[in-house]
């Protein structure tokens, strides 16, 4: 089933910081892997949170024709690791199981089938041997894999990821990207904030280029070009033919 996110004239302002985002317009048709890219402080994470309905915004955001708050059951969200309390005394298995509780009614216990899905997700991210380990003892890459396993058991149609590759090892990045591609094959729509430009063409089907507004959006090959990147990064991005991109 095709999915659709519509962003119309969206803006975000704060009392001490007006126009964090203004006049944002884009359409995301899924299944797809879409990257939100732009320089530091450009409003990438703010846009993601606005689409989720986590912060107040002007304009209109629709997910499958509904407001975000009406379709929260379709969405899984992984925030930046810097915003998560690693000291909370919980194991990998318990953390992943929290994702399954969103499928249940209040105070409804997890069933054997639920726990089987939890264990299968932990196995898929390669952490079965560590399932009883406290999350505070994990590396950044291991913990990010735990968060993706938690998304798996939610069985959401939309996956929103805020900087999932920051501070992780290459193995974890490979595991995570394999899972993300599998999600797309299953018909899911993934929207991901990303500051690293080196793998934009490899990772994303579509790109939203942000600098306090949506400068351009669409297929990666149409947006990730010198014309738009110069507008956003001030000419500091070098794009060699067939090579990597550097800011």
Feature annotation, model-predicted:
Residues 1-23, 85:
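A short, flexible loop at the N-terminus of ABC-type nucleotide-binding domains that lies
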Residues 59-71:
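Conserved ABC transporter NBD signature motif
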Residues 111-130:
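Conserved ABC ATPase "signature" region
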Residues 134-138, 142:
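Conserved ABC ATPase signature
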Residues 159-163:
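Catalytic Walker B motif of ABC-type/P-loop ATPase nucleotide-binding domains
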Residues 194-195:
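H-loop/switch region of ABC-family ATPase nucleotide-binding domains
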Residues 208, 212-222:
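Conserved switch/coupling elements of ABC/ABC-like ATPase nucleotide-binding domains
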């Amino acid at each position: 089933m095709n999915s659709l996110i519509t962003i119309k004239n969206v803006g975000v302002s704060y009392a001490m910081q007006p126009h964090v985002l203004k006049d944002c317009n884009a359409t995301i048709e899924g299944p797809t892997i879409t990257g939100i890219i732009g320089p530091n402080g450009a409003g990438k994470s703010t846009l993601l949170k606005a689409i989720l309905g986590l912060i107040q915004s002007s304009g209109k955001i629709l997910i499958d024709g509904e407001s975000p708050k009406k379709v929260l059951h379709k969405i899984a969200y992984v925030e930046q690791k810097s915003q998560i309390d690693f000291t909370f005394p919980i194991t990998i298995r318990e953390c992943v199981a929290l994702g399954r509780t969103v499928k249940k009614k209040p105070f409804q216990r997890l069933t054997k089938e639920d726990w089987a899905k939890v264990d299968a997700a932990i196995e898929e991210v390669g952490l079965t041997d560590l399932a009883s380990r406290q999350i505070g003892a994990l590396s950044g890459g291991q913990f990010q894999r735990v968060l993706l396993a938690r998304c798996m058991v939610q069985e959401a149609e939309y996956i929103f990821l805020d900087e999932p590759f920051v501070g992780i090892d290459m193995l974890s990045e490979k595991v995570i990207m394999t899972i993300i591609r599998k999600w797309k094959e299953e018909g899911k729509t993934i929207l991901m904030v990303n500051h690293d430009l080196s793998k934009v063409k490899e990772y994303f089907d579509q790109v939203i280029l942000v600098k306090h507004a949506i400068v351009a959006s669409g297929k990666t090959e149409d947006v990730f070009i010198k014309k738009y990147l110069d507008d956003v990064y001030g000419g500091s991005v070098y794009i060699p033919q067939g090579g990597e991109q550097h800011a």
